[in-house]
Amino acid sequence: MTLDLAAFARDKSIKYFMISYTDLFGGQRAKLVPAEAIADMQKDGAGFAGFATWLDLTPAHPDLFAVPDASSVIQLPWKKDVAWVAADCVMDDRPVEQAPRVVLKRLVAEAAKEGLRVKTGVEPEFFLISADGSVISDQFDTAEKPCYDQQAVMRRYDVIAEICDYMLELGWKPYQNDHEDANGQFEMNWEYDDVLKTADKHSFFKFMVKSVAEKHGLRATFMPKPFKGLTGNGCHAHISVWDVDGRVNAFADKEMAFGLSAQGKTFLGGIMKHAPALAAITNPTVNSYKRINAPRTTSGATWSPNTVTWTGNNRTHMVRVPGPGRFELRLPDGAVNPYLLQAIIIAAGLEGIRSQADPGQHYDIDMYAEGHLVKDAPRLPLNLLDALRAFDADEGLKAAIGAEFSSAYLKLKHLEWNAYCSHFTQWERDSTLDI
């Protein structure tokens, strides 16, 4: 039974609803709707000019309506009279096929048709920085190896504990918070869930972290590589696939190597097979490739892959299998679109199952120290353009995630790349002025 948002508002003393959708660039767009108007909005959606956001629409297109999914509603823990609700984009009574949440829901349905239910968890890393974005916010956070630094995490206790308290209140079952590998960097973990719920939570988490940071006079950034020499922001995804009832882990087989079933290996095979193209989605910005292809950081490791390899419980590879029945994809970064991350995982994995893709040889080596010894593993893209070209050339993955989405995404991302290429940098001036 669908939750009545008007009744929810009366019960929770909600004054306003934020009807929110995410565009192709990961931008979160919303209208603030008074509770008195939510009944009509729940039925018809909130109207937007689609051209005004990144969805590959023109000014001539009719209104885009964001129809709230009542099952996703969250009362803001820090502002109780406002509720946030994720929405699906509709135009002329039809889904907008390139809209990220629509793309994900279609792939969830495809997996269900094959008797599969995908569950994931994400680990979004972020920096707490000054309000102007110029430096990390804690002037005393200067250790060469700051990961898990007890003093540093407690100096930001007010921010981290407030966010964690809100996750506890929302029933997300958070289980740990830590200072990450870069100065000023943090990670907060909560329990895995069905992919759509994980994507909605991921989207809300970014909104919540930024809001709480602003409340404390700070700024939170999920930018992949905001500071030269420091470890970048990853967004590792832990993936498992279950039967449609969510009771039997289809990836788990104690008799198989790494505890990963034959079906799990073909799903992983799809991830490995399509990895260079996958990067166009999991690493969607120019800055993303400053993380993937970074030299050694201050701490001694980038903690990000640059080669398409997999392993057991070893964090130097693109895919880690830490235990039976699941694997960790370490490729995505903090700029990844919460909905497209989950969508591309399902698309590549299902294509892998259908084609019986082999994940190839696993490696037990330290890729940071010995990666040069691996001669036959593909390198990940050097930059966004290489990733876009890999995605455009991967007809199987484009078909799996959807032709309308693929066309719109490639068009807009090529425009972004071209804008970057026309930008004049200080490096060019320093390197060329006196030639």
Swiss-Prot record:
Residues 100-435 form the GS catalytic domain. L-glutamate binds at G232, R291, R315, R330. Mg(2+) 1 binds at E123, H236, E328. Its cofactor is Mg(2+). GO terms for biological process: glutamine biosynthetic process; nitrogen fixation. It comes from the Bacteria. SUPFAM superfamilies: Glutamine synthetase, N-terminal domain (SSF54368), Glutamine synthetase/guanido kinase (SSF55931). Coiled coil: none annotated. Homooctamer. Belongs to the glutamine synthetase family. PANTHER family: GAMMA-GLUTAMYLPUTRESCINE SYNTHETASE, GLUTAMINE SYNTHETASE. Catalyzes the ATP-dependent biosynthesis of glutamine from glutamate and ammonia. Two forms of glutamine synthetase (GSII and GSIII) can be found in this nitrogen fixing bacteria, GSII is a typical eukaryotic glutamine synthetase whereas GSIII is a divergent type with very low sequence similarity to the type I and II enzymes. This is Glutamine synthetase. It comes from Rhizobium leguminosarum bv. phaseoli.
